[in-house]
Amino acid sequence: AQWLQDRWTEATGRTDPFEYNSENIGILSDMLASEALVALDNDSNAIGWYDRKIKAAKEVMSLVEPRIMQSPESEAVFDFVLAVTSNGQAVVDNFEMATDMFRFYQRKGRLPESKKEFDKGGERNAAMLEAFKFHNAFSASEQNRALREFLDEDFTVKELNAFADDFNSQIGFDAIKVPSAEGADVLVKGSYVLGPKIGQGFYQNIRGNYDPLTMDIWWMRMWNRAIGRPFVDGLDDTAKNDRR
């Protein structure tokens, strides 16, 4: 990281990170676009790599558990639990937990709601259980669309909050919790309720929609390297809101 920072200082002539302004946004856009073009020149197979790997992983999983690809409904359940159990987990652990949760659903027609039923995931266990409770509540409610349709539907954050308030009042508890990471007029998918990274990003990518960006730890490391703060923690929520 220090070597990269030294290269960054030499290339930019700066010692302080880029400030957040329109001029620097343009500079960073050009910088990252140039990196992407170099990567594509070195390996043109990078185009569509993620899509190919996701599809290949599902093909392998269908050998382990054939019911996953048995119907659009069963695939949607697996995609949901794969996204939810990715939270802070290694890839192998993620797929193992997702398979366990899929089989739990096949046996019981619902996902687990207590630590007695599901105690994996470490410190992310509570967040996973909250997502499972949401899945169960929505699936059991008499909505005019399937859960997978809701998760792929477009909303503004304001509209999604209104839907959540109405839904939660109908079922008597806060099954849907809309994150505050985006402004009220920002367009998101219903899956945003699972979180900006897990729901708006990774879940959509698993489902084949690659327009949303999954800003995981690797993306953040790239971004911090580009702006010149590889050793500094990211902005807190207050600073993020000030910049919207």
Give residue ranges: language-model regions.
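HhH-family (HhH-GPD) DNA N-glycosylase catalytic core used in base-excision repair
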Residues: 1-244
